[in-house]
């Protein structure tokens, strides 16, 4: 019969191997083939007199991906979207949207994009039907064509239960649902979402993201997202972080976390006195006591540290940094209730 010590060693070996495997698996998932570009931006600039709102930024967005644009109010996110969607003229630089050059082929760019603005452009006094019919006519479709285009959105957006209700009477989540449906009427290749869940309660936010997930899965849309909810970047293939008109970081969520945050180790012991010894061994004063365990930041050697102290540690977890940690590291500011 195996001893308790033997069983404990086997437990730690399995758990350490699990964390090492998960780290490699995450890295492998991020490696992919070169993809076609939906958007290519080179040294794009927007100035208002002497003030530079967007300062010579360059990035690209692959077709079919969710691309997240992060930054505080005034960082330049919405200005960038407004330039790429032809609403604002650029000052300098070049950009291509689905192969069409910004400033030279704007009519074709507008055919390729749909935009959900932070503030809705729909009329609160009109019903959902009236709003969508009006918008469809704006694209040059007759009633029959509009209804045909809405057929594909009818079920997935649950339009039937709110079809004849006034827009102003809808809940926040329902309004966003119709805003997205409006932006998809002409079947664009790219959907710009400018702070799509700002002001929504958690349930409505989840509803919006359920619809976005459905669209990504079934329509292969390229989605360009601006947000201040860090958890909304979790599914993004690539993230760009802006501050004061400049790009200060870019990469996959995992790359940014690896580059700008530390892993955290949480261990569980029976006695606080034993944890105090572990903290001394770790050589760090940055820890947090939570009931019966400690949380300590360590950059390297976590698994070695745990193995060395397996006689004291009863269980452990290794927690990666978050996108909130990334933003805090880069800017020294917490991303709380910011937008724009």
Provide a role label for each language-model segment.
Residues 264-334, 340:
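Short, charged/small-residue-rich alpha-helical element at the C-terminal edge
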Residues 187:
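Conserved catalytic motifs of ABC-family nucleotide-binding domains
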Residues 191-194:
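Catalytic Walker B motif of ABC-type/P-loop ATPase nucleotide-binding domains
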Residues 166-170:
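Conserved ABC ATPase signature
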């Amino acid at each position: 019969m195996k001893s308790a010590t033997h069983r404990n060693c086997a437990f730690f070996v399995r758990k350490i191997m699990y964390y090492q495997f998960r780290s490699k698996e995450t890295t492998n998932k991020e490696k992919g083939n070169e993809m076609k570009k939906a958007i290519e931006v080179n040294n794009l600039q927007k100035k208002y007199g002497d003030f530079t709102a967007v300062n010579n930024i360059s990035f690209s967005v692959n077709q079919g991906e969710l691309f997240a644009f992060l930054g505080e109010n005034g960082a330049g996110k919405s200005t960038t979207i407004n330039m790429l969607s032809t609403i604002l003229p650029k000052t300098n630089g070049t950009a291509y949207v689905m192969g069409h050059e910004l400033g030279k082929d704007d009519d074709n760019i507008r055919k390729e994009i749909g935009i959900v603005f932070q503030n809705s452009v729909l009329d609160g006094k009109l019903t959902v039907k009236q709003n969508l019919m009006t918008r469809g006519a704006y694209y040059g479709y007759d009633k029959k064509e509009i209804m045909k285009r809405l057929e594909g959105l009818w079920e997935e957006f649950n339009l039937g239960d709110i079809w004849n209700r006034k827009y102003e009477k809808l809940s926040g989540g329902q309004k966003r649902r119709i805003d997205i449906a409006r932006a998809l009427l002409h079947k664009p290749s790219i959907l710009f979402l400018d702070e799509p869940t700002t002001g929504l309660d958690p349930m409505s936010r989840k509803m919006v993201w359920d619809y976005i997930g459905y669209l990504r899965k079934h329509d292969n849309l390229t989605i360009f997202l601006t947000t201040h909810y860090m958890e909304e970047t979790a599914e993004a293939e690539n993230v760009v972080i802006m501050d004061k008109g400049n790009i200060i970081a870019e990469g996959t969520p995992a790359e940014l976390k690896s580059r700008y945050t530390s892993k955290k180790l949480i261990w569980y012991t029976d006695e606080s006195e034993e944890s105090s010894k572990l903290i001394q061994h770790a050589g760090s004063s940055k820890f947090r006591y939570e009931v019966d365990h400690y949380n300590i930041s360590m950059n390297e050697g976590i698994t070695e540290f745990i193995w060395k102290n397996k006689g004291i540690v009863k269980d452990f977890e290794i927690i990666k940094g978050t996108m909130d940690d990334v933003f805090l590291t880069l800017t020294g500011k917490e991303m709380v209730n910011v937008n724009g």
